[in-house]
Each structure stands twice: as structure tokens, then as C-alpha cells.
Amino acid sequence: MQQRRPVRRALLSVSDKAGIVEFAQALSARGVELLSTGGTARLLAEKGLPVTEVSDYTGFPEMMDGRVKTLHPKVHGGILGRRGQDDAIMEEHQIQPIDMVVVNLYPFAQTVAREGCSLEDAVENIDIGGPTMVRSAAKNHKDVAIVVKSSDYDAIIKEMDANEGSLTLATRFNLAIKAFEHTAAYDSMIANYFGSMVPAYHGESKEAAGRFPRTLNLNFIKKQDMRYGENSHQQAAFYIEENVKEASVATATQVQGKALSYNNIADTDAALECVKEFAEPACVIVKHANPCGVAVSNSILDAYDRAYKTDPTSAFGGIIAFNRELDAETAQAIISRQFVEVIIAPSASEEALKITAAKQNVRVLICGQWGERAPGLDFKRVNGGLLVQDRDLGMVGAEELRVVTKRQPTEQELRDALFCWKVAKFVKSNAIVYAKNNMTIGIGAGQMSRVYSAKIAGIKAADEGLEVKGSSMASDAFFPFRDGIDAAAAAGVTCVIQPGGSIRDDEVIAAADEHGIAMLFTDMRHFRH
């Protein structure tokens, strides 16, 4: 098999025209004949490039409002023809070989994302000729290069220059993989969209299926292979969504440290998503996907100091997330005080990075600033299936709370209640969080009974010498019995925030009144499993 194939004729037809003129100029300068269609051909001609319209090349005009442009034997025969095997039939039918196909597809995703997009608009943005050429070229990658990403343009020209105008089989095969990934993702988007239109399309209902289509096709790109998974006997890799806009662990840049492990990524995600909940300078310390210390303050240094005090033992080997730039003082405090696996922040000063560089094993991630949280889907794998739900972006403000007890909370109790309610959302259920003066003082996570989570939170506060008297307590779900309130009162809690909704709410409220506790209902639950 010939490893290198010269590029003498290329067909260019792109929706995203970024970089296409420069790429076409580079090809033309290297003696490559250019074929093109529609808007791409007009653009290249306007730039003075010698380009042949596909309709002139085939002798068959574009028709049906551009629906039929490249679906012709002279095009697909030129792409699919096997060099050295189909030469005679190609010559008989005057089919010239096409050595490179440069195609990206109609912007279907952008079209259906527009408000008010009709089914007719969506249908007209389903590319037919493009995917057909892409698949044809990818199938015949032994002889043809298929280019679907503008990010590959420069590398292709460099390789052609290094190989007297040719591309290697390894490159063509790699480009073919990208091509099949591209068409698979494209067809998945269309299938998901059409699936979401059922049953409205068939008149079975006035409403479309909505957020969850009949079949779910997912497209993720591998970012890295892992040494192992959650445990050393499990193989693992990290896949990310394409074109993610929101700052996340998936989009973050690692500026120092060892490669991230499976557990590092999971824990860093938990820490970052929690710290995003706060507008004030905040620090979140996470261990095994649970916050073990959270605080807000006037500076991230003080926020870190206070978060660390919640549970210094658990903070060892933890993940630390900030919602402000990592500065030198805070970096020094962390490095001097504890062993840390990962630090993630929107940015880091040069001085801070010089300090963390002294501990080369510490992983430092820069994620950039974030704006409004983007809606999306959460997935949970079960044996033989996949549970899918909206991301839990729900949160309540002070004006949405209901005071259900005789006593009203003080201003500080209310602030602490809202603070620990935000934290409880990220603690594994059953979750109980004690907070005072904008810092956690005890966290009870993952217990099978809510009362034991409440007891553990109190024990942790006592172990660290943190005063519980006058604190607020958050529960991620309702109290089924009064025992959780009794345990909180015994520890010194004076305000409780919880969803409400138990058949025994009256008993729970009565217990709060007996202890002089103010109780707030959120009418929103935050289970986390």
C-alpha cells in the first residue's frame, strides 16, 4: 500500500468559512486544482483564486434550491475511485480523481438553538451532500484526505511541504477518524432533535416530547487517558463535551502538577460547582466529593483560613476551590499548612504560581471566570441503563423562604441559613450542615438516617472546638421525625432551614417551637446521591 498520496485536486465546500480562503490560497500556490460549490466558490473567486464550480465540472446544474449540488458520479466517483483498481472505469466515464475533500456541515445545532426555529427551518439545515462526501472520502482514506476541521489546515500544509505535496497514510487515516466522528455527532444532533418532536409531529399530543428525546445520542471527546479509574483495577479515561462555554473542570487549564487522576477530576468538579454558588470571596475544600469546609469572607485568604478550621483532618489531601484569583498570600498559606491534591481558581497571580511551583506535585488548575450557570443534563449510569435529569441549578433567596415557627430568625441566623443551604446542596444525602458567621462548623454527610447526619455534624464541630450555640443548620431534605431537631437543639443550633413536605411537618415544627428554634421552609429539595 502506498503510504503517501499527492494532492492534485481538492473539493472545498464549507459552511464555516473561517480560514478557508488562506487554506485555499496555500493549496493553489502548491499547484492544487480547486473545485467548489455555492458560497464557498463565490468567496474564493472574489479573492482571485482559480476555482471551478462543481456544476461546471459535472456539467449538471445545482437544483432544488441547492438541495442537489454534489450528488453526482463525477464527484463521488472521483472521491471513491480506488487508485490502481478503478482507473479504467474512471477513464471510461471521464471521472477525474479528487485527492482532498474539505467539508464542514450546515449549522444544524445553531439553527435549532435559535428561539422560534420551526421544523421546516431545521429540515432545510440538514446537510445531505456534505455528509455524503465526508463519508465517501473517509471510506477511501487510502487515497483521499478528508478535512472537516479548520484547526487541521495549517498542519496539512506543513506536511505537504515536508512531503513534496503529499500526505501520509497515517495522516489520512487520522483525518478519516475525525470525519466519521464529525458525521456521527451531526446525525446524533438531528436524531435527538427529531426525537424531541415526538409525539407532537404525529398529532398524538399538542406538546413535543421536550427535553428528553425518544433516543439519546451522546457525543463526547476524549481529553485524556487515566492511569486507572476510581480504583487501581479499573481502566478509565476523561471525556468532555465539545464547545462548553461555562468554566468547568473540563475546560480548565492545568498549569502545574502531576496528571489529574479520576478521583481528582470528580472531586475538583464537586469543589468548583459548590464555590460557584457564592458571590462573595469563597473557599470550598472537598474530600471524597463532599465539602469538608466552606467559608465566605472579604478575602480568599480569610475564606480559606475559616474553611480549613471546619475540619483540618479531612482537609489533608483535599481539593481547594476559589471563586477569585489565587493570590500569593493564599498560596503561601496553603503550601505552608497542608498537603493538597488540587487547587482550582478562575486565575492565579504570577507570584502565587511561583509559590505553588515549590510543590511540583500540587496540581493547579485555571478555569477562567464564569457567568450565569448553563442549563444541561446530569447522567447516572445504572446496570443496563442511564438516568437522565436536568442539572440541579435550583436555589432560593430570602424572599422565597417561609418562616413556619413562632420565632423569626435574626439577620445573622438568616444569612447563615442561606449560606449553609447552598453548601448542603453539594453534600451527599442525607446531608446536614451547621454554619455560623458565614463558615461551616460541622458537616454530616451520606448517612442512611438524617438524625445521624445531624449528630455527626455536632460531633465534628465539638471536636474542632467550634461553638455551635447560635448557629444555623441546613438539611437537604425534610425531617421525617422530630429527632433531628432535638439533636440540633442539644448541640446549640438556633435556626433550621429545610425543604419541608413531611407528613410529620407539624411535629417537627412543634419540636422547633419547644426549643425556641426558628425554622425556614424552602419548598425545594436537594438530594445528592
UniProtKB/Swiss-Prot annotation:
Residues 1-148 form the MGS-like domain. Keywords: Acetylation, Hydrolase, Multifunctional enzyme, Purine biosynthesis, Transferase. GO terms for cellular component: cytosol. InterPro entries: AICAR_Tfase_dup_dom_sf (IPR024051), Cytidine_deaminase-like (IPR016193), MGS-like_dom (IPR011607), MGS-like_dom_sf (IPR036914), PurH-like (IPR002695). Its EC number is 2.1.2.3, 3.5.4.10. Coiled coil: none annotated. PROSITE patterns: MGS (PS51855). Pathway: Purine metabolism; IMP biosynthesis via de novo pathway; 5-formamido-1-(5-phospho-D-ribosyl)imidazole-4-carboxamide from 5-amino-1-(5-phospho-D-ribosyl)imidazole-4-carboxamide (10-formyl THF route): step 1/1; Purine metabolism; IMP biosynthesis via de novo pathway; IMP from 5-formamido-1-(5-phospho-D-ribosyl)imidazole-4-carboxamide: step 1/1. Belongs to the PurH family. NCBIfam families: PRK00881.1, purH. This is Bifunctional purine biosynthesis protein PurH.
